[in-house]
Design a protein with these regions (language model features):
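RecA-like P-loop NTPase motor core
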Residues: 1-103
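Activity-critical C-terminal alpha-helical subdomain
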Residues: 99-191
Length: 192
């Protein structure tokens, strides 16, 4: 055959897939949850959110995530393409759910353009939140997300984070995580 040079570095080809699998193999086996139907997400918090929301929907007799779907954290948007390339040659049903912010837009569009995943299989939180930019956390009601962060940080009642506080702290973004981060940066060092 000889060496072939291609401008499409992310195309899937059996001859190029094996070295990628070998290179990523160790890292992936350390944190991988893979199944025939797989949702690739950015991080472990996304796995927890999707599992908790699915269980809550199931308890309410509503449509929930089919248990045949496995949720796999990839370690960030930058690694989703590698994971998708790695698994695409294995006849797996793969979809991805990722954040969609200013720094993510070009990466998401590049992932869609590579066609590693079938059309319609690259989903963003913005596809479901109704906001132009979103993280998976934006799928929660802002009151619930603020209460979760308040509880996780062990903040006293007078320091509880509210959606109003969050919006005031970062009015230039609609992303709840960025807003709550701004509130947290303004908390006194001795907080809670």
């Amino acid at each position: 055959h000889g060496t072939k040079v291609s401008a499409d570095v992310l195309s899937v080809d059996r001859d190029t897939l094996f070295p990628l699998q070998a290179h990523l193999g160790y890292e992936i086996t350390q944190s991988l949850f893979i199944g025939k139907n797989c949702i690739l997400v950015e991080g472990p918090s996304d796995v927890l959110y999707l599992q908790v929301v699915s269980r809550a929907l199931q308890a309410r007799k509503r449509t929930f995530l089919d248990p045949r779907w496995t949720i796999c954290p990839t370690g960030g948007l930058d690694k989703i393409t590698s994971f998708a390339s790695l698994f695409s040659g294995n006849n797996l049903n793969i979809v991805t759910l990722c954040d969609y912010g200013t720094g993510d837009k070009k990466k998401v569009e590049r992932l869609r353009e590579t066609q590693i995943l079938k059309v319609g299989r690259v989903l963003t939180a913005a596809d479901f939140s109704g906001k132009p930019e979103s993280d998976v956390e934006d799928l929660f009601d802002p009151e619930i997300y603020c209460a979760l962060v308040t509880a996780a940080l062990g903040l006293e009642k007078n320091r509880a984070i509210t959606p109003e506080d969050a919006e005031k702290a970062a009015p230039d973004t609609v992303r709840i995580t960025k807003q709550v981060e701004a509130v947290c940066r303004a908390l006194p060092p001795e907080t809670p």
